[in-house]
């Protein structure tokens, strides 16, 4: 009795409730329930807005700084900031923040090989590390350890060398001081 359905609702009531004429009054109620459910995500969720605004702000700064590389005389204070000193924070991949590692900001073509960009998530800034004289670094890496001991004695450091571990500490101090 009403087991086949060809497009016309069965009035007897054995058909599914969505096709009966009496269920049409309950369909706005279910729609109304869906409206209430869809309104909840429209309310701002805490914490997401700040992160999104920060991301937009950083993208805006990157756009300004990439323009800065074409006209370096427009923003001299930006050039000074980008040529800052060394940082002890290692380089990290910045792809999760929407930045690309090969994108250089405010760095001229002749400085391309000497600049390292790194993202520091704890401070929320993009840091640049410039090696102004890369030959000095290479010189220390290839240097004989006995010559560094002679240099530390000639500098008058006053440290007595009793073992190889102290020599390594002195070498680290010399590298950091330069």
Curated annotation (Swiss-Prot):
Bias (Low complexity): 14-28
Protein's gene: SPEAR1
Sequence motif: EAR, positions: 170-176
Complex formation: Interacts with SPL and SPEAR2.
Region described as Disordered: spans on this chain: 1-48, 139-178
Protein name: Protein SPEAR1
Feature: compositional bias, Polar residues: 144-167
Keyword Repressor: yes
GO molecular function: DNA-binding transcription factor activity
InterPro entries hit by this protein: SPEAR (IPR040356)
Expression tissues: Not detected in leaves.
Protein keywords: Repressor, Transcription, Transcription regulation
GO biological process: negative regulation of DNA-templated transcription
Function: Adapter-like transcriptional repressor recruiting TPL/TPR corepressors to inhibit TCP transcription factors.
Motif SPL, residue range(s) on this chain: 46-54
Originating species: Arabidopsis thaliana
